[in-house]
């Protein structure tokens, strides 16, 4: 089904987002609800939705703001969270995830968004979109709440690949710097390399080698390298970009999520403990609400796959309408600034001796 847009905007003004409607834990209803939130806030955003046509069309027809803003592409197969990436690669044609990536590959859409299986999404994205020249391992970058002026730091890799050698870490630094410059409007981002200490003699061999490589590139690439940083700096203001391997990065963000949940639960318990504490919670409510808004993970939901010939945003699998809308907002911003082209130019600008042989 292809709905007529009925809009007065020119074709060039549109940002078309390809959405895997079947990937999330909450099902297509939450994904379509997220599209609805985005459509009401962003009149220049249009959607190609992938999933069983009858089911998706019925959900779209219930949302007034989506009328004339969506094309539904029939895809009856679904990639589940339990599917192994190797199995998905062999049997993915006809799935909503495959179809969503294909829309970026064939130029129908600028960015793909999926709440689905991370490993499968990365595998399909690498196969269908291919890696940028000079990139050995793509990375997943997320915005992590911080005390910096912009409110977030860029953290990568957070799970694309558990291994990373010195050359990979250099490329992560350049890709993360490009993301911070274009996505957070930081003209000269500060980059830190995550380690067990800040002293130059600490850490594994590949970290020490990466230290030298990144340091050499800071002036040619236009960023400031602050050296080694520790786990406490991920949410601090020492740097804007934190570079690490996918194993460490994934543990870091999930530890952060768990800690945030623990603190939230303990606060609720404390405020419910006595009548006086319940009264105090009412007095503190405006401040607590502002705090929640600042650190709400749904506001920055979306990991960006960096290093591919196309932009893919991975939303949290359990995202609700607010979370999906945040991922779509991020996707639209990246499409608007033509981020993939800028990233490709940045990676291609490395001196020949620094590129992967």
From Swiss-Prot:
Q: What is one Gene Ontology biological process annotated in the Swiss-Prot or TrEMBL record?
A: phospholipid biosynthetic process
Keyword line: Cytoplasm, Lipid biosynthesis, Lipid metabolism, Phospholipid biosynthesis, Phospholipid metabolism, Transferase
Where found in the cell? Cytoplasm
Tell me the pathway. Lipid metabolism; phospholipid metabolism
User: Which reactions is this enzyme annotated as catalysing?
Assistant: a fatty acyl-[ACP] + phosphate = an acyl phosphate + holo-[ACP]
**What this chain does, per the record?**
Catalyzes the reversible formation of acyl-phosphate (acyl-PO(4)) from acyl-[acyl-carrier-protein] (acyl-ACP). This enzyme utilizes acyl-ACP as fatty acyl donor, but not acyl-CoA.
What is this protein's name? Phosphate acyltransferase
- Tell me which species this is from: Roseobacter denitrificans (strain ATCC 33942 / OCh 114) (Erythrobacter sp. (strain OCh 114))
Taxonomic lineage of the native organism? Bacteria, Pseudomonadati, Pseudomonadota, Alphaproteobacteria, Rhodobacterales
